[in-house]
Structures are given as structure tokens and as C-alpha cells.
Amino acid sequence: MILGILQARTSSSRLPGKVLRPLMGRAMILRELDRLKECREITRLVLATSSDPMDDELAQTVEAAGYDVYRGSLDDVLGRYYHCAQRYMPTHVVRLTGDCPVIDPHIVDQVTAQHIAEHNDYTSMTERFPDGLDTEVMTYAALEKAYQEAALPSEREHVTLYIRRHPERFRVGTVDCAEDYGAMRWTVDEPQDFALIEKIYERLYPQHPVFTMEDILTLFREDETLAHINQGIMRNEGLKKSIAAERVL
């Protein structure tokens, strides 16, 4: 069984409550779940949020929409993933994040299929893909090993960091993009990110609700002003801050 775990919380430091912001009349997190529901490789899909009361509304919103919810540690996200996976005992786990409302289910399937075909412990995407399509796949055994061995705060907060830091201990694979679109930013961390996502949905969703990466790229070619809306924001800023904080200590 392949379990898709979408991690999300309400307490974003840069854009609090972003996952519940209305996007074409529906909470952003539900838009992402609706897209992930189209994945053919994922057997079961669950939202993993925290047990903190501030995430009560998030959990209730997602459950009311008919999706499974697991609640665990706020800060030990690796532990939250592992205990969530324990409930379902999958063979593989697909890691997804709640700040990617234009995630492409076809790419999720591509990464998952390659992971299985190559018998990898862990498979990720290169940064040649636009930021906001993030998909990682790992075996349950690899997740368990990371849970048991990861000690640094950054490795508990960022679920797959321990695996990526120890490639000698895992069979690791990557999925590359045919062209380099790494400068494009389709994730939501800042107000200008959400402004861009709103425009993408307004332009594409009415005609094609499950629009793809290629559809967005075509839209950007037709309207070059879109790329300027959220220029200049650092990729993976949260991860870089966590690692920098440990170096200071």
C-alpha cells in the first residue's frame, strides 16, 4: 500500500492561516487534497497536522470534506509522519506539503512510479522543477530508520533531511526535469505567493480543474508578468534557517 501524507499546520510564521485561505471559494488545503486525490499511485491519502488546539479548525475542515486526518506533534514532524504511517502500515510513503496548491498529480505519480521501479529507499525531485511541485517518496522502513536515528532538531522538523544527509545508508534516486524551471516559484509562503496562485487558479481552473505543470508553463509564456509577482523569495528558506540556527549553537 502506498500512503500519501500531506503535512500542514495553521501556524505559518510568514503567512499564518494560509492553508485555510479561500482559493476560488474553497480552502487552499482542500484544493491541494482535491488534486492529490487524482493520483493513481497513491492508495490512501491523509492530512497530518498537529494536536495543538490552533489546528482544530484545520482538522475539522479537512474531515468535513471527507478526508482522513492524523494529529501528532507540532515540532517533531518526523515523529508525526512516522506515527501517522504506523496507523496504516504502508509499504511506501509519499511526503507532500500543504503549501503546494498547484501540485501536479501526474508528477506525483511519476516520482512514485520511478521510486518503485528502481527499488529505492528514497526518491526526490531535482530543483530543476518549479518550486511548489514537491514530492518525495520513501519506504516505510526508511522512514522508520530516520525516526529512530535522527537526533538534530532540523532532522526532526524536516522529515527527510536525515535520509538526504546519509545517502550512504539508503538507496537514493532522483527524478529530473527535462528543462530547468527552478527559478519559478509556485509554492505559498508569502502574501505575493498567494496572489500568484490566485491568478493561476482564476485563469486555469474553470476550464481544467486538474491543470498540469505544462498548463501553468503555457500560461506563463502567454503572460510574462505572472513571474514577476513573487520574484526574489528564497527557495527552501525554512530549511536553511533551521540548519543555520544549529550552526550558531
Positions of PLM-derived features:
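N-terminal glycine-rich phosphate-binding loop and ensuing alpha1 helix
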Residues: 1-49
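Conserved N-terminal catalytic core of the sugar/cofactor nucleotidyltransferase
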Residues: 30-91
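Short, high-confidence coil segments that cap the C-terminus of an alpha-helix
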Residues: 42, 89-90, 117-121, 170
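Conserved donor-nucleotide/metal-binding helix-loop-beta segment in metal-dependent transferases, i.e.
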Residues: 83, 104-130
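Basic phosphate/pyrophosphate-binding loop/patch that engages nucleotide-derived ligands
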Residues: 87, 110-121, 139-155, 165
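Conserved nucleotide-sugar donor-binding
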Residues: 90, 133-147, 191-195
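Short beta-strand-to-loop acidic/aromatic patch adjacent to the donor-nucleotide binding site
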Residues: 90-100
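Conserved alpha/beta core of the MobA/IspD/sugar-nucleotide pyrophosphorylase nucleotidyltransferase superfamily
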Residues: 138, 160-249
